[in-house]
Amino acid sequence: MAQPWFQVAKVVALPPAWLWFRWRFEHLELIPARGPALVACNHASYLDPIANAYAVVKAGRRPRFLAKDDLFDIPLVGRALAGAGQIPVSRGSGDRTPLARAERALAAGEAVVVYPEGTVTTRPDGLPMAGKTGTVRLALALRVPITPMVSWGSAAVWQKSGPGSLKPGRPVWVSVGAPIDLAADHDAILDFDAVRRMTADLMEVLTALTIDLRDRYPKRWADAR
């Protein structure tokens, strides 16, 4: 049932985004073309899911997101998210069901997109905050490499503090980094300190990629992130 809803979402959401923003995608070939793909992203804007979904779709994959459960309560939006196979997450509840569903999706060879921070960053510079351990635990449990992905440019439109500029033509850049393979550390999955260190390492990678993208972003739009 997920495929028809995914096609509807792709037709409804992506064309307007394509027309409104000026997109640049880098290194999409680093997203696995088949088999399980665990994509970990920075989160500077509420528009990030559109940018990240766009990149994953352009790479030839159907993304499944871990999304806030509040979104599933919105009429039509919630039905579309559930119908497209997205995974609701109740932040701070300790419920392990979303991770179990993500594990099943990865085991079935799907592409799962996660935001290790768990929410949009509150840092004034727009860089990633500390990450939660779920992404690393997924990678260790399934022996799946983490594919880091970062975006820059959409936060000026809609960030944590609220909606911003809707000026058309704003560049939105998305870049994919080299995969992070944690398979050799599989046995450390029960070592919480080790998992926290690996999570900190993941966030360092996402931060470095974000800084690189930010520093190359057009200066004319320097207010964006």
Put a short name on every predicted segment.
Residues 32-93:
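Catalytic core of membrane glycerolipid acyltransferases/transacylases, capturing the structured
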Residues 4-5, 97-225:
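Non-catalytic C-terminal accessory region of glycerolipid acyltransferases
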Residues 27, 42, 67-68, 85, ...:
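A secondary-structure boundary/capping signal
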Residues 16-18, 56-58, 80-81, 105, ...:
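A generic structural signal for well-ordered alpha-helical segments
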Residues 1-33, 51, 75-84:
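A transmembrane-helix-recognition feature enriched in membrane-embedded lipid enzymes
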Residues 18-25, 96, 155-158:
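Short gly/ser/thr-rich secondary-structure transition/capping motifs
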Residues 29, 43-44, 69-71, 92, ...:
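Short, flexible active-site-adjacent loop segments at beta-strand->alpha-helix junctions, enriched
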Residues 13, 83-89, 118-122:
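Short, basic, glycine/proline-bearing loop/turn elements
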